[in-house]
Amino acid sequence: MVIDAHAHLETPIHGVTPDPGRRRSTHLLMWSYEILGFRNPLWKGEPPGPARALIAMENRLRLSMGCKENLLRYMDRSGIEKSVVLPIAPFSTSWDYLEACAEEPRLIPFASAFPAPGWEKDLEEAVKRGCRGLKIHPILQRVAPEDRFYFDLLEEFAPRRMPVLIHSGEFDYYVVRDGFAAYGDISRYEKLVRAFPEVPFILGHMGLYFPEKALRLAERYENVYLETSFQPLKVVREAIRVAGVERVMFGSDWPESDPRYALRIALKAAGGDEELRRRLTGWNILALLR
């Protein structure tokens, strides 16, 4: 069974409205990046200013594809049986995702919480109703990784021993230089990871432009898992070497990326090793979904 560990549904951020009529993801810069296997011959590390602006624009266009009908269509085309879908409160809520997944067994909803009155009760109810994990996104939520809220949130969530998928990597989302990209710096996540050793933390995108930071954290903490979206084959192979075959998993971050490309890299990383292939493309995330 192939499971995409990282996908999203309707997330109306910065005025972007999901449009079922928008069905293609061939935007020049992002499409080129996918075709090249997420290798970038033009620059190393973070993109320069003009490229950042183009990436932000293309991200908004791709986000507008993010409805359930399109996700299922991309899953069918890519040979994906199930997808973990991740809300980002306050833009999309646990309730939005529970409703979207209610009659679609191929979608596995996570919960999300935001520092607003009543979040504790909402989180408890979301888990009771079927959410299988928690999504944290410091950049888009505009909450610093060191903020007391995340520690209170994990204190509440940790006894369930469910996975927490946290965005990792400094990145401008949809608006260039809005001042919050630094919240994705993985070095700022260590206190949270260390404080809750019983919680499986999945680093979404494995650090984006800074995978070495994700690898260092995974090397130091056994409760850190690595998700492969936007990472080239070389980095995925290194992740398997550093973290081991049980702590790396395929994810695409759909609709920001066509799942075919990240899945192709995961399959190449497995080579002819059938057990590794199954672990990367389903077993590892399935083992965390209690």
Question: Language-model features: where?
Answer:
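Active-site gating/metal-coordination segments in enzymes
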Residues: 81-82, 86-172
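Mid-to-C-terminal alpha-helical segments outside catalytic/metal-binding sites
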Residues: 1-5, 13-73, 77, 82, ...
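Alpha-helical scaffolding within the catalytic cores
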Residues: 67-71, 93-98, 118-121, 186-189, ...
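Active-site neighborhood of phospho(di)ester-bond hydrolases with catalytic His/Asp-centered motifs
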Residues: 2-5, 85-86, 110-111, 135, ...
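Conserved, mostly hydrophobic/aromatic
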Residues: 6, 75, 126, 134, ...
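Histidine-centered divalent metal-coordination motifs
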Residues: 6-12, 167, 205
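Glycine-rich phosphate-binding "P-loop"
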Residues: 52-63, 85, 168-180
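Catalytic pocket-lining loop regions of alpha/beta-barrel enzymes
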Residues: 133, 143-249
